[in-house]
Amino acid sequence: MDVIYIQDQEIDHYNGQFYHSKSEHFFSRFLAGLNENDTLTVYTGIINRNCAQEVAKYKDVTNPRITYKQVPEFRNPKNLLAINRLMKRVLKDADFCYLRSGIAASFASTICLKKHIPYMAVVNEDIFRNTIAHSRLLVRLSAYPLSYYTHRMVREANYACYVTQDYLQSNYPCKGKSLGCSDIEFLDINELSLTKRLNKIQKQAGTIVLGTVGSVDTELKGQDTIIKALAKLKAEGFTNYIFQMVGTGNVTHRTQSSCRVGDC
């Protein structure tokens, strides 16, 4: 059985091994239900690292039953045709696909629908919200077409797996079978609780700690926005703020961002 997983997002490669920033089971979980002789081919962005330190905090996802193949850099518009050609070639004999929201998956879904190849949409983000407010103009311009094709990919999927219980399901509905796999529950926030919290912050005389939880090496989590805001506060004389980040990934880029705005 020829099973294929497709995503834009990058994994890391060093010394013959492959690494993921979050989980050692990120791809092996898709082997469930396959026979021992079946294999999974993952088409993904791959970053080649030059030293062990760069992947020291990442998870080894090397697996004899998983083959990793390079997808061209999706952020470069010149590669769009190459990605489309690649999808046409690799899906020629595919039996089933896992498509994670993105450009490559959007191309792949068009081919799957044309060739009647069953697939599962892996819906892990609100792709419109993540692109429409991006710092790069080119990414913002891609928000509408990418949103359209992502909505179609999810809507027409045989199956959809969501990382939320309600939010993504309501924004990216699927006509096929779907599953929400989030284990996070949000408490209701009323106006009184919000007012009390804001008053507490305004009366805070000591150090105020700001925190984010999420991958530290992606631009979509908002850490750079906080770093820039803190730099402006510092320039205005407000220095009683500390920013703490919790998450997987290489923190080097965030440190460089801090230095660029003069806060290192």
Regions found by a protein language model. Name each.
Residues 48-77, 262-264:
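Conserved nucleotide-sugar phosphate-binding/catalytic loop shared by glycosyltransferases and other
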